[in-house]
Amino acid sequence: MHVPVMPAEAIELLAIRPEGVYLDATAGLGGHSGLIARQLTTGTVIANDRDTRSLEMARANTAEWSDRMCFHYGSFGSLSDAVSQAGFEKVDGLLADLGVSRYQLTAPDRGFSFMADGPLDMRMDASIQTTAADLVNHTDEKTLADLIYQMGEERRARRIARAIVRARPLRSTLHLADVVERAVPRTGRLHPATKTFMALRMAVNDEPGELRRLLEIAPGLLKSGGRMVVISFMSSDDRMVKEKFKELGQSKQATILTKHPLQPSDEESFNNPASRSAKLRALEMR
């Protein structure tokens, strides 16, 4: 079972009401959705995800509360449809966890990770046309370097892009990881290919664009007094969330509930290393 990140903090800031309607924009394997559902009586959780396999697992993992659950397959751009198709106009709370689940990272056929060999896919949604293999094999060197630098925050992006272009064609995750490691040897605890893989995943799934769409759509889906909680793992994502929240606060549309982002406790970071870089921000619509 996927362990949800910062569960206590997220649930507290959502201020769950037993009869409320809550949209989990990133249901994943259902960790946060289940925590919300168990606090409801006549309320509803709308569990949304763009990964069909994850959504089916979320359905199975929340079966105990099936009478309180609705499921919707789609990207952030379709969240309005998720709410209306569940029979509601607005919600009392919205949660978005921008991380990648352990299931996605460890399933070799998904191609998200170099922990096992697999195809260079990285698509969260099978309807996406471009795969990671397309990017590494057909993108020009400068564009590839810019992508790795900007999305992966990888300072050695030019050297990595040069090595990738020279090694073409690349067909598997371990092949790519080996090429990157040869170009930029390990200097710390992180595998040298970690940021490159992250950048490719973000590009394939247009994660920056998806986050922008979420931040534009979400305020209009929340009732007055409705709360929005976002958990991000990249500094670039956290900056986008911070700026949007600041804009909503300054325009008096919302009250920011987290003056500074919350971070996992030492205990959580130890027990769930995937949570270490998490930052949680929350607001309440006026």
UniProtKB/Swiss-Prot annotation:
SUPFAM superfamilies: Putative methyltransferase TM0872, insert domain, S-adenosyl-L-methionine-dependent methyltransferases. InterPro entries: RsmH, SAM-dep_MeTrfase_MraW_recog, SAM-dependent_MTases_sf. Coiled coil: none annotated. The keyword Acyltransferase does not apply. GO terms for molecular function: rRNA (cytosine-N4-)-methyltransferase activity. GO terms for cellular component: cytoplasm. It catalyses: cytidine(1402) in 16S rRNA + S-adenosyl-L-methionine = N(4)-methylcytidine(1402) in 16S rRNA + S-adenosyl-L-homocysteine + H(+). It is an enzyme of class 2 (transferase). It comes from the Bacteria. It is found in: Cytoplasm. Keywords: Cytoplasm, Methyltransferase, rRNA processing, S-adenosyl-L-methionine, Transferase. Residues 260-286 are annotated as: Disordered. Its main location: cytoplasm. S-adenosyl-L-methionine binds at G30, G31, H32, D49, F88, D97, Q104. One of its GO terms (biological process) is rRNA base methylation. Its EC number is 2.1.1.199. Specifically methylates the N4 position of cytidine in position 1402 (C1402) of 16S rRNA. Belongs to the methyltransferase superfamily. RsmH family. This is Ribosomal RNA small subunit methyltransferase H. The gene is rsmH.
